[in-house]
Regions:
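Catalytic and substrate-binding clefts that recognize carbohydrates or anionic sugar/phosphate headgroups
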Residues: 30-31, 35-270, 298-299, 661-673, ...
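Aromatic- and carboxylate-enriched substrate-binding clefts and catalytic-loop regions
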Residues: 149, 176, 306-566, 601-603, ...
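Short beta-strand elements of extracellular/lumenal beta-sandwich folds
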Residues: 707-722
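Catalytic core of carbohydrate-active enzymes
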Residues: 470-476, 494, 498-508, 513-693
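Short glycine/proline/serine/threonine-rich loop/turn segments at secondary-structure transition edges
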Residues: 766-775
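Secretory targeting and sorting signals
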Residues: 1-25
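Short acidic/proline- and small/hydrophobic-mixed sequence motifs that coincide with surface turns
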Residues: 631-633, 722-726, 772
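Extracellular glycan-recognition regions
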Residues: 29, 794-989
Length: 989
């Protein structure tokens, strides 16, 4: 009955309502200007389709505030920052008092003094019904860059931008959503960037900003938590911006698309939308050969892991730019291609426009003028550094160069039965000079035109910033991601950012990540596949059968459940393909993104503006995959009538589904029964094998001390349409812990939608170790069914002291310490622990490390506000001396993985570095010393060790100190501390 009703309701079309219904007005009304004692007011009247707005221009200190319906919706920055800013002589200046103005032919011209003597701002503001143009420049003062600055809070939340560079590791492991909830520091934001970016931002108050420039920008949003948005163009030329003022964010997006253009086609085929692309990169990185690739394809084929293409990524060439096979690793490429085709896959290759200086083709390209020339000396080729060495770049503006390169590609494809290509490249570099008659921005267009000649096999191409890129309809793949939960979450919000700047055919980075980090865990890999199954396309690499850990060189085997659940995600996506293909056709008509934030469809739903782990896939499907640990989640449903595809129930929104069941085999998804395509979506997504109940344990991160009681709550919920019986709640605890229930732990039955809530007083063992401990809430029902949820309870240390023979020392005033058996804790501030500063807290053993020594410890956990916070182990001749000699540290940073740093000249400053990768805990750290040779190792399990780096430390002499160190590295976060917990510290000498 419920399904029949749902399908009937699906025939009713949905309507998107604006935030503010525009008043009806005379369509012939024109903007006008009025003046008061301290302001100019520009009024743009409402029309049948636009809400109207007011621009209030403060004249005492030039500031621009945009208002709609009597409320401010966007305001420039004030105070010392200034809204209209420019840099001159290395110092920032801004516009001040308006000294003159004129309103003529629909343009408001302003003249303003500035904080720099002899410099004047000239601004022109041109209002129309749904936007205004703001152009301005500086006369006098010799500026070298101009910028707009806004008070972020004046416009609510901010979105757009594309792939954002952030101090927290973006775009690889971080993508704040909304942007103002994080920090964006994007200093090379320009048309030649490898990142998928466009100079467009929009807000929850339905305003938007587009900067019209072909120059590099410096963009900062909430840098250092300053609450400002600074959009700086690194040029003295006229600053050109469009400010959109609409009723909803979707209408702002549509106005923007009206300028830059919508896709004229989709470069991906139906099959490429329906099935994954399997690319070799994250499976092998550069350690790939013919045998490995064929084994990979065979495993996928034999395990029913469907896909349309096997794509061979980097390291097949004899040298970069040769476009010839490495005969050692690929002795029979044509035979390999045939075997891949025989398994039912297409075959593709990775290519680039970089030609390395030592390649066979480089000199030929130089001799024939095929390469971009150097910007500083146009008589010589431009040499650039990329991730595989030093290279030149083919000049696509040279018809002969393009013909030569394209001819080589097509011959390669013909000779070896290659069906398509993955272009992984930049088409221009800021170090190079555009060909005469061209600009830097033209190279994005030229790259687009080149790529459009080939089947891109669902890998698309990373072009942006111009109308050609928007109109080409390429699939957009993300920048390389890490392999942890943070990267999975970033892959979702990054797609929302990319698709809402005008690139609608999005896919995440390779499922499981591809950033050269340890192999993804089973849970991350499965959850990523589930998430991707509810996106327009699936882009895969890491095999759920087995893969290789690039950090250790070890093989990683996944279990059968991993294979089964990954296959299930592929099948779900294939079933959903007819619905997705319908959305592709709709996008070609409207330009609207397929994957989009909830508030595009539900602009009146305030909660939708901050949801980070849900999205709409077309108008009917709300995707809410689980993107973190645990087996439950809270799902936000906007207003409407929603069909739960997992349980067959109908739910009326708005509603928050707390503790929604999401065990590893379940992907939460809901269908808007009044939306177009609802029936097709239900047919694809409806399941009959999902557990009826869930259990939620909260809080999700309880904290306590050894032997100190705390409370948790378990809440069992029946999500099905029938009653469940014989319900029993329980709590599984670590050894030595106890729990007492207050309230019922059993129920004879729970009706549909019913809950059983139990509060538990949990007491850790008196000697419970510091760090995380699993607490698992379980519920059994209907005698044989069981569901569970797990949280990590943190047992915290309390500052105290350490016992002999351990000593402490600090180069920061706020260091504190504790010891509990073989565990240690350090609380410390400190601006940095490298180079210019050496501020830290230390627990150490004096004169314990000989000339041949191994120092080892487990870093249990670390917690700091600063993403640069550091904790680990150290060696030195004397850890208490400023000029230590023999000084080396191996630390884990809060966000940026491992750092092995040494002092090369004995002055006490750490000045050499190795490391990187992802941050993980617990981390096993090891430093070995052999005379002046130091080597650093790290491990996740204390069994398989990876070498981080080796360094010579000439000042190492005699027996030295060794210990555990921590520094908040808080130079950008003044006053913040780090808390680090260690165990298993040892020295063998």
């Amino acid at each position: 009955m419920l399904l029949a009703a749902a399908l009937a309701l699906a025939l009713i079309p949905s309507v998107t309502e604006p935030l503010t219904t525009p008043a009806r007005a005379d369509t012939s009304a024109q903007p006008k200007v009025t003046r008061s004692a301290d302001a100019l007011t520009v009024s743009a009247p409402a029309t049948e389709k636009t809400p109207g707005y007011i621009i209030d221009i403060a004249t005492g200190e030039l500031a621009i505030t945009t208002e709609r319906a009597g409320e401010a919706v966007l305001s420039t920055a004030g105070g010392e920052t200034g809204g209209l800013r420019f840099r001159s002589g290395g110092q920032w200046q801004h516009a001040t008092e308006v000294t003159d103005w004129a309103w003529k032919d629909g343009v408001l011209a302003l003249t303003a003094d500035t904080t720099l003597d002899g410099a004047t701002v000239k601004a022109r503001l041109t209002p129309t019904s749904d936007r205004y143009q703001l152009d301005w420049d500086v006369e006098g003062g010799s500026p070298d860059r101009l910028g707009l600055a806004y008070d972020l809070s004046s416009a609510g939340h901010w979105y757009g931008h594309g792939e954002a560079e952030t101090p927290q590791g973006g775009p690889g492991v971080d993508q704040p959503w909304p942007l103002d909830t994080g920090e964006v520091e994007h200093g090379t934001f320009g048309p030649a960037s490898y990142n998928m970016i466009d100079p467009f931002w929009y807000t929850s108050t339905a305003t938007g900003l587009r900067v019209d420039t072909g120059d590099v920008m410096d963009v900062a949003l909430n840098k250092g938590k300053d609450g400002l948005g600074a959009f700086t163009v690194e040029s003295p030329d006229t600053y050109k911006a469009t400010v959109f003022v609409e009723s909803t964010p979707l209408e702002v997006y549509r106005d923007y698309i009206g300028i830059v253009g919508k896709p004229a086609k989709s470069d991906a085929t139906y099959e490429q939308y329906a099935k994954p692309l399997w690319n070799s990169w994250a499976q092998f990185y550069t350690k790939v050969d013919q045998e490995k690739l064929l084994d990979y394809a065979t495993d996928l084929h034999d395990n029913g892991l469907d896909g349309h293409t096997i794509q061979l990524d980097d390291k097949w060439e004899s040298n970069y730019g040769n476009l010839t096979w490495d005969p050692t690793t690929f002795p029979d490429p044509k035979g390999m291609s045939k075997k891949i085709h025989d398994m039912g896959f297409d075959f593709g290759l990775w290519v680039t426009l970089w030609i390395n200086l030592d390649s066979d083709n480089y000199q030929h390209a130089v001799d024939n003028g095929y390469l971009l020339m150097d910007a500083k000396d146009t008589s010589k080729p431009c040499e650039v550094t990329w991730w595989n060495g030093q290279a030149g770049i083919i000049d696509l503006a040279n018809p002969d160069a393009r013909a030569w390169y394209e001819g080589n590609l097509k011959k390669l494809m013909s000779d070896y039965d290659i069906d398509g290509l993955k272009f992984d490249t930049r088409f221009f570099d800021e170090k190079c000079a555009p060909r005469e008659g061209h600009q830097a921005t033209d190279y994005q267009k030229l790259g687009t035109q080149l790529a459009d000649e080939f089947d891109l096999q669902g890998a698309g191409i990373r072009v942006h910033w111009n109308e050609t890129a928007h109109e080409a309809g390429f699939v957009t793949r993300q920048v390389d991601k890490g392999t942890g939960w943070d990267s999975l979450r970033a892959s979702a919000t990054q797609n929302l950012a990319i698709c809402t700047i005008g690139y609608p055919f999005v896919e995440s980075d390779m499922i499981g990540g591809s950033g050269g980090q340890p192999a993804p865990s089973k849970n991350v890999l499965v959850r990523w596949a589930q998430s991707a199954s509810l996106m327009p396309l699936m882009y895969a690499s890491t095999s759920p059968v087995d893969t290789n850990d690039t950090t250790t060189g070890q093989k990683v085997d996944y279990d059968q459940e991993t294979v089964d659940l990954y296959r299930q995600a592929i099948e779900t996506h294939k079933k959903l393909a007819p619905y997705i293909w319908d959305q592709v056709q709709s996008t070609l008509k409207t330009g609207d993104p397929i994957m989009r934030p909830l508030f595009f469809d539900f602009p009146k739903d305030k909660e939708s503006y901050t949801v980070t782990d849900e999205w709409m896939l077309g108008p009917a499907v709300l995707a809410a995959p689980k993107l973190s640990t645990g087996a439950t989640r809270t799902v936000h449903l906007p207003p409407g009538t929603w069909y739960d595809v997992n349980h067959g129930t109908v739910i009326h929104g708005p509603k928050n589904l707390k503790g929604y069941a999401a065990p590893l085999g379940v992907t939460p998804a809901f269908v808007d029964l009044k939306a177009k395509g609802a029936a097709k979506a239900i047919k694809a997504l409806k399941r009959h094998d999902v557990p009826a109940a869930s259990v939620l344990i909260s809080p999700d991160a309880p904290s306590t001390g050894s032997g100190t009681p705390f409370e948790v709550t378990t809440e069992a919920t029946n999500w099905s349409t029938r009653a469940i019986r014989n319900v029993q709640a329980a709590l599984d605890l670590p050894d030595g812990w106890t729990a007492t229930a207050t309230g019922p732990t059993t129920a004879k039955s729970l009706k549909a939608g019913g809950t059983l809530t139990t509060t538990w007083t949990v007491t850790p063992a008196a000697d419970a170790r510091w760090g995380g401990h699993d607490l698992t809430g379980t519920v059994t029902y209907d005698r044989a069914q069981k569901v569970s949820d797990t949280v990590r309870a943190e047992v915290k240390a309390a500052p105290g002291s350490v016992t002999a023979p351990y000593l402490t020392t600090a180069t920061t005033d706020d260091a504190r310490y504790a010891q509990g058996g073989d565990q240690f804790a350090i609380w410390a501030g400190g601006q940095d622990l490298s180079g210019w500063k050496d501020e830290k807290g230390v627990i150490y053993l004096d004169d314990a490390a000989g000339e041949k020594a191994t120092v080892q410890a487990q870093l249990v956990s670390q917690d700091s506000t600063s993403p640069f916070g550091k904790a680990g182990i150290a060696l030195a001749n004397d850890l208490t001396a400023p000029g230590k000699g023999g000084y080396a540290v191996l630390v884990m940073t809060e966000q940026y993985g491992l750092e092995f740093m040494t002092d090369s000249d004995g002055n006490g400053a750490l000045d050499t570095w190795a490391g990187g990768g992802s941050t993980y805990h617990p981390a096993y750290l090891k430093l070995t010393r052999d005379g002046t040779a130091y080597t650093a190792y790290a491990s996740k399990d204390s069994e398989t060790w990876s070498r981080v780096g080796t360094a010579d430390v000439p000042s190492a002499a005699g027996t030295g100190d060794a210990g555990m160190v921590a520094s908040a590295a808080n130079v950008s976060y003044p006053g913040e501390n780090i808390e680090a917990v260690f165990g298993g510290f040892s020295i063998t000498s």
